[in-house]
Amino acid sequence: MAVKTYNAGVKEYRETYWDPNYTPADTDLLAVFKITPQPGVPREEAAAAVAAESSTGTWTTVWTDLLTDLDYYKGRAYRIEDVPGQDEQFYAFIAYPIDLFEEGSVVNVFTSLVGNVFGFKAVRGLRLEDVRFPLAYVMTCGGPPHGIQVERDIMNKYGRPLLGCTIKPKLGLSAKNYGRAVYECLRGGLDFTKDDENVNSQPFMRWRQRFDFVMEAIEKAEAETGERKGHYLNVTAPTPEEMYKRAEYAKEIGAPIIMHDFITGGFCANTGLANWCRNNGMLLHIHRAMHAVMDRNPNHGIHFRVFTKMLRLSGGDHLHTGTVVGKLEGDRQATLGWIDLLRERSIKEDRSRGIFFDQEWGAMPGVFAVASGGIHVWHMPALLSIFGDDAVFQFGGGTLGHPWGNAAGAAANRVALEACVEARNEGRQLEKEGKEILTEAAKSSPELKAAMETWKEIKFEFDTVDKLDVAHR
């Protein structure tokens, strides 16, 4: 056995953390970063610096390295690839031994991968593009409280996407008027209504009063329609104790689903709430408020596909994913990629959709993809074509903005959805025949006809800021 010796001083990171001959183990956590190095910093040195700072390294040699098996615990930069069309950037692939991370802790994984390293002077820009979680680590995480199939069984809804609506205006309504809007939307044909991300417990509408009026609306709509209904009661709160207090009250009054803002609320709170929901039979809707602060810049931050994986591990039955066709950012191919990462059990590397690694989820349940943001009845054919059945389509303004009121807006969306599902089941091409399908359905639905007339000119044709880098080995 070789004798370890300590030589004080500073040495280049690549001497220890660059290992192009390394073959990743099945149990390694793999990450790919898009790096923009400072001028004059070699690619291998920049990649090794990221591997060091996100694992065992520091800026100088330390004698305590001799007290551990550094060769086992260190992260290894093992491959570098060009970013298509970007001479100053490259992809760095890094392997981390699984023992660097606390079991079942998304918090700990994020603290390592995107902690101090993002302020490193050796790089001008750093973006975490994708992560491969080994199955051995996936199995230590709780994941979604219930998942897609259990939710369908709870809500008794099969063979189609679910329909929702975010109540607007998002702020300022009294609890009673808020409950009235919920009732009208649910009675009109929606499956769910929703608190917006910043509806918590403000002076104009305290949380307990909102919960009570909303539950009254749900029970009334269920009695009149014979369908199971729900409303995402946002339990995000200033403290974990207050969050659980609100969750317990939602359970007490019979609500089927609650909601959490998982980024602003934090992964620690989210994982705890997901565990509580699993133990108490409550569904959990997840909003991604604040995500674009970190994922929209193509040169620095965290890609949203990483957030989808982190959320699936931390726990949630629904996650907002963008719409492709609405008002929010979302490249079509990249969106299709992270939808699969949320819902499927096994996903293969597919650079055309931005997926850098194979990902196995084992028996972990899937998550409903939620399409929300600037959508209306004209988008229904494209939404069904893009998302398929295991999704929630949430029309906020596209319901409440109907010229005849909330119930009519809900009815228009329900008719449009059922017409598109029937057409798809008959083998028709939704995105090519969408106008014809909706026009035919509107002949027997004045609510749909009015909605189509109202929003016939509304489009959101802005170019995507975060374009997909199509890279091949």
Curated annotation (Swiss-Prot):
The modification N6-carboxylysine is found at residue 194. GO terms for biological process: reductive pentose-phosphate cycle. It comes from the Bacteria. Its cofactor is Mg(2+). The active site is at residues 168, 287. Binds 1 Mg(2+) ion per subunit. Keywords: Calvin cycle, Carbon dioxide fixation, Lyase, Magnesium, Metal-binding, Monooxygenase, Oxidoreductase. Mg(2+) binds at residues 194, 196-197. It is an enzyme of class 4 (lyase). The keyword Magnesium applies. It catalyses: 2 (2R)-3-phosphoglycerate + 2 H(+) = D-ribulose 1,5-bisphosphate + CO2 + H2O; D-ribulose 1,5-bisphosphate + O2 = 2-phosphoglycolate + (2R)-3-phosphoglycerate + 2 H(+). Gene3D superfamilies: Ribulose bisphosphate carboxylase, large subunit, C-terminal domain (3.20.20.110), RuBisCO large subunit, N-terminal domain (3.30.70.150). GO terms for molecular function: magnesium ion binding; monooxygenase activity; ribulose-bisphosphate carboxylase activity. Substrate binds at residues 116, 166, 170, 288, 320, 372. RuBisCO catalyzes two reactions: the carboxylation of D-ribulose 1,5-bisphosphate, the primary event in carbon dioxide fixation, as well as the oxidative fragmentation of the pentose substrate. Both reactions occur simultaneously and in competition at the same active site. The basic functional RuBisCO is composed of a large chain homodimer in a 'head-to-tail' conformation. In form I RuBisCO this homodimer is arranged in a barrel-like tetramer with the small subunits forming a tetrameric 'cap' on each end of the 'barrel'. PANTHER family: RIBULOSE BISPHOSPHATE CARBOXYLASE (PTHR42704), RIBULOSE BISPHOSPHATE CARBOXYLASE LARGE CHAIN (PTHR42704:SF17). NCBIfam families: PRK04208.1. This is Ribulose bisphosphate carboxylase large chain.
